[in-house]
């Protein structure tokens, strides 16, 4: 009924998972299964043994069904990531999502493309996902991202193409969030192309912005 992605480096807190599954079981039995279940996630820093929790208590109502009308402002560090979401499987089928094969960073597509199909959400203030970070060869390591920037660009272009954001004008908060998420993807691509610094990277940066201009309306651009 629900689909949760867990990276091979990461893990789920067993006590939190039990509570989430119990709540979903109750909601399904009542016929009020949410399209999207949201929980907190925790950065587990391997270098110094510290941790940092990303929670959404200021963004979402807790322990009840809600929709985008009830969603408040996201801080820059509060994007919905793969770590924080659990989609109802039928929603993933409905959106027709096909992830690029043999490509890193597709978790951004996974969390982004289904959002217009989400009609109901549920947030539990539980630290469910533990995100292990700090390994030298991780895909989010700076030098690794510079080397894989073409895959970041491929994912960003896929996200530009996969939704017509102007079709969401009647859902202001959803549209605002999705434009914001796409802006973050553009910014990340820009940063790593600038860090590369080569003439080829600068050309790729210009090409990406031209691609965006050619594939969205001036209002989105």
Question: Which residues does each PLM region occupy?
Answer:
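Catalytic metal- and UDP-sugar-binding loop of GT-A-like glycosyltransferases, i.e.
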Residues: 6-8
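Amphipathic alpha-helical repeat scaffolds of TPR domains
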Residues: 177-191
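Short, charged, amphipathic alpha-helical segments
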Residues: 172-180, 202, 206
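Short aromatic/hydrophobic "clamp" motif used to bind/position activated sugar donors
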Residues: 3
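C-terminal, non-catalytic tails of nucleotide-sugar-dependent glycosyltransferases
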Residues: 151-176, 217-219
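Membrane-interface aromatic/basic loop that binds lipid-linked glycans or pyrophosphate carriers
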Residues: 195-221
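Secondary-structure edge/capping motif, primarily at the C-terminal ends of alpha-helices
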Residues: 135, 163-167, 189-197
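Donor-binding/catalytic cores of nucleotide-activated saccharide
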Residues: 10-122, 129-145
């Amino acid at each position: 009924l629900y689909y949760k992605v867990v990276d091979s480096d990461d893990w789920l807190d067993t006590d939190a998972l039990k509570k989430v599954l119990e709540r979903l079981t109750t909601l399904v039995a009542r016929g009020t299964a949410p399209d999207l279940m949201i929980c907190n996630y925790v950065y587990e820093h391997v270098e110094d043994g510290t941790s940092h929790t990303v929670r959404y208590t200021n963004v979402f109502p807790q322990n009840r069904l809600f929709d985008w009308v009830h969603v408040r402002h996201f801080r820059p560090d509060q994007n919905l990531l793969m770590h924080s979401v659990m989609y109802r499987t039928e929603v993933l089928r409905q959106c027709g999502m096909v992830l690029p094969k043999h490509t890193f960073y597709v978790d951004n597509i996974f969390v982004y493309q289904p959002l217009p199909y989400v009609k109901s959400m549920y947030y539990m203030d539980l630290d469910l996902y533990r995100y292990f970070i700090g390994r030298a060869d991780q895909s989010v390591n700076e030098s690794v991202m510079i080397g894989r920037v073409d895959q970041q660009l491929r994912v960003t272009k896929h996200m530009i193409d996969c939704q017509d954001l102007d079709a969401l004008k009647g859902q202001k908060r959803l549209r605002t969030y999705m434009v914001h998420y796409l802006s973050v993807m553009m910014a990340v691509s820009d940063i790593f192309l600038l860090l590369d610094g080569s003439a080829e990277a600068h050309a790729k940066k210009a090409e990406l912005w031209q691609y965006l201009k050619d594939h969205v309306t001036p209002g989105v651009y």
